[in-house]
């Protein structure tokens, strides 16, 4: 199977299963493990062949699947840990999340997780309000968008990603377990429906349409 197509179909199936059958599970944790270079190579193939019908349909499926995650009324946490592959298309999972935590390993740069942007993060997978997730994140401000675009292809460590505004927090290995535990326990202590409306407001903070108003809160 072709990885981008298989990944999109399996992710879509997982989202629909969780939304339909796990109604009491109010927080979802998003992780991506593997070879970031392979993800970027896949993105390069998508970009180079974007006018081919199969690639065009695959990009469309990825766009719809990620948009389905955006309008899921659950709290989304992305954990960028050692061995993570949040690069290019998979980095969109971190940008979908309400909070993204990235592990900082200042004493072991070789093992530190990296976040890598590609051209696919700039408009190929728009949200249901027609913004890219980076545009939404930076309120369409020119300076941070240009800074992010200038980092395309760079393997960003936690400090660099935090400086660019790409992650919520970057705890070091001493604080990581407690920071993540507290964040998840805080959310789990509330009703699954308690914050979903507020989080949907933040996900679509600039531009709303009927899809965001209805599906983002159901």
What are these regions (language model features)?
Residues 1-7, 17, 23-24, 31, ...:
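Amphipathic alpha-helical segments at domain termini/boundaries
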Residues 2, 13-15, 85, 100, ...:
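Sparse, context-dependent recognition of short Cys/His-centered cofactor- or disulfide-binding micro-motifs
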Residues 4-53, 57-81, 103-108:
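A structural preference for short, pocket-lining loop segments at secondary-structure junctions
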Residues 33, 67-122, 149-150, 154-155:
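Glycine-rich beta-to-alpha active-site loop
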Residues 47-55, 117-126:
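Glycine/Thr-rich beta-alpha phosphate-binding loop at enzyme active sites
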Residues 77, 118-137:
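Glycine-rich phosphate/ribose-binding loops and adjacent secondary-structure elements
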């Amino acid at each position: 199977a072709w990885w981008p197509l298989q990944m999109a179909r399996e992710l879509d199936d997982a989202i629909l299963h969780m939304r339909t059958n796990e109604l009491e599970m109010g927080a979802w944790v998003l992780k991506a493990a593997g070879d970031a270079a392979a993800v970027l190579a896949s993105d390069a193939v998508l970009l180079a062949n974007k006018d081919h019908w199969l690639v065009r349909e695959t990009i469309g499926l990825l766009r719809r699947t990620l948009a389905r995650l955006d309008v899921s009324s659950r709290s989304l946490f992305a954990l960028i840990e050692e061995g993570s592959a949040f690069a290019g298309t998979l980095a969109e999972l971190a940008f979908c999340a309400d909070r993204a935590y990235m592990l900082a390993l200042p004493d072991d740069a070789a093992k530190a997780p990296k976040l890598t942007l590609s051209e696919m993060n700039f408009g190929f997978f728009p949200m249901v309000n027609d913004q890219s997730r980076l545009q939404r994140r930076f309120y369409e401000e020119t300076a941070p968008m240009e800074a992010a675009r200038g980092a395309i292809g760079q393997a960003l460590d936690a400090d660099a990603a935090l400086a660019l505004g790409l992650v919520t927090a970057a705890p070091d290995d001493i604080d990581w377990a407690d920071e993540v535990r507290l964040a998840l326990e805080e959310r789990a202590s509330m009703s699954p429906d308690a914050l979903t409306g507020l989080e949907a407001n933040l996900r679509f903070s600039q531009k709303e349409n009927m899809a965001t108003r209805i599906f983002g809160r159901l």
